[in-house]
């Protein structure tokens, strides 16, 4: 079994059925970034842009990838006990991942890989609310 990979999934304003809410467990990344290399067991930091009113500029939870195609990623949504702010990401992402994160202004539904350490830096001091 391969080690999981870690990603930031950027969510803009949810507009089903093409763009879903983070709690739905379905993510439709911008197709121009396909193919998506996610595999079951990979982890997503679910970041909401300023246009996502309910969770603006925050990471309210993580996703564990269940399956991925060229148009959508299905995941198990797990809320965090305390959301992570954009400032938390700016402070805790490693330099290479922070440089990628600065490019979110180009797409409100962008998916990009980050290091395991960056992922842990964000979630380490927060609990995951298991159902």
Predicted regions mapped to residue ranges:
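Compositionally biased, charged N-terminal/linker segments
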Residues: 1-40, 113-114, 119-131
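Compositionally biased, low-complexity repeat tracts
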Residues: 8, 21, 46, 57-59, ...
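Structured loops at beta-to-helix junctions and adjacent beta-edge loops in soluble globular domains
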Residues: 10-12, 47, 78
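Short, flexible loop/turn elements at secondary-structure junctions
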Residues: 13, 48-50, 66-67
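Short coil-to-beta transition motif at edge beta-strands of beta-rich domains
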Residues: 34-52
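Aromatic- and Lys/Arg-enriched surface recognition patch
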Residues: 56-131
């Amino acid at each position: 079994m391969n080690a999981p990979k870690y990603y930031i999934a950027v969510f803009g304003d949810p507009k089903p059925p093409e763009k879903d809410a983070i709690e739905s467990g379905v993510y439709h990344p911008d197709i121009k970034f396909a193919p998506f290399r996610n595999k079951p067991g990979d982890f997503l930091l679910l970041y909401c842009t300023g246009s996502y009113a309910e969770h603006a500029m925050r990471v309210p939870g993580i996703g564990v990838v269940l399956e991925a195609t060229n148009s959508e990623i299905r995941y198990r949504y797990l809320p965090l006990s305390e959301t992570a702010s954009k400032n938390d990401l700016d402070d805790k992402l490693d330099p290479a991942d922070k440089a990628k994160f600065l490019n979110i202004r180009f797409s409100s539904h962008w998916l990009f890989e980050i290091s395991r350490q960056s992922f842990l830096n964000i979630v380490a001091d927060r609990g995951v609310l298991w159902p």
